[in-house]
């Protein structure tokens, strides 16, 4: 008889904000199997193979697995964050942090339904045929996911004013910003694709140039929004990373943010040619050929 240990894991290795609804269920099922086969213990684990991972975001997973392994029945997942935050934070702060956790969990779930593994989706081509098909089927999931991410940011910025556990709360804020950026990227790309389709055959040039101004204008356009969101998220991620780790490997995610920024510079430049280089009855080029990511 060889002693058996069961090991669970936070679902964080391809998800920059953990998929708690998945990992909580995984914990329950693994613990159930461990009891069935008389396991002598349960191990929690988190993974940092992916350089986008902030381990502080997985702390609720660590707590859930540790608690669940000592219970005779599965934990009430709906009540978990209420109890978790009451133990960690003062009463005046706990409810706000609980709301932030729940909003983040909703945001991650909605966005994951749309894009799958969020780490990869953050850097993929939003104008590919595959991405635009995803957008068409998931507009509501992306929209709801972004709203929930923004809701979480409101709670977290309020909680950070307390000066309590600011390192963990800031990591959560970075997770919310990344979810916000991810949803924004695909919503904007889908909106641009819809605009391109509407005007692809012929167009009133005055109207078309005004619409294109909302996409590429120097001030307050969609592409400028993307520049700002990428740069802000990058610098926040850098700070959160250095709160947890040494600078080793930090250059990898930083380079990815830089590549994403350069990509949107290119998108803006190429889209701007549509407004001025084509006559009113001249067909616009195929969107994928115009904006292909290299």
Where does each model-flagged region fall?
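Substrate-binding groove of N-acetylhexosamine-processing glycoside hydrolases
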Residues: 1-294
């Amino acid at each position: 008889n060889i002693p058996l240990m069961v090991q669970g894991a936070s679902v964080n290795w391809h998800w920059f904000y953990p998929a708690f609804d998945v990992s909580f269920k995984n914990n329950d099922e693994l613990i159930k199997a461990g009891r069935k086969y008389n396991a002598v213990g349960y191990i929690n684990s988190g993974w940092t193979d992916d350089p986008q991972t902030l381990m502080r975001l997985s702390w609720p997973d660590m707590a859930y697995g540790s608690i669940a392994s000592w219970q005779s029945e599965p934990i009430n997942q709906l009540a978990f964050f209420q109890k978790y935050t009451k133990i960690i934070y003062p009463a005046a702060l706990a409810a706000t942090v609980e709301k932030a956790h729940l909003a983040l969990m909703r945001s991650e779930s909605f966005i994951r339904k749309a894009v799958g593994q969020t780490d990869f989706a953050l850097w993929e081509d939003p104008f590919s045929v595959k991405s635009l098909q995803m957008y068409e089927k998931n507009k509501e999931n992306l929209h709801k996911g972004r709203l929930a991410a923004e809701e979480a940011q409101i709670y977290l910025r309020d909680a950070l004013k307390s000066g309590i556990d600011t390192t963990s709360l800031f990591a959560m804020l970075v997770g919310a910003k990344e979810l916000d950026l991810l949803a924004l990227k695909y919503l904007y790309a889908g909106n641009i694709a819809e605009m391109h389709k509407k005007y692809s055959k012929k167009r009133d040039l005055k109207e078309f140039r005004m619409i294109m101004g909302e996409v590429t204008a120097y001030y307050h356009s969609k592409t400028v929004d993307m520049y700002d969101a990428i740069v802000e998220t990058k610098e926040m991620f850098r700070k959160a990373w250095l709160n947890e780790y040494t600078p080793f490997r930090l250059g990898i995610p930083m380079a990815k943010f830089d590549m994403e920024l350069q990509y949107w510079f290119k998108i803006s430049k190429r889209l701007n040619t549509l407004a001025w280089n084509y006559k009113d009855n001249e067909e616009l080029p195929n969107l994928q050929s115009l904006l292909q990511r290299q």
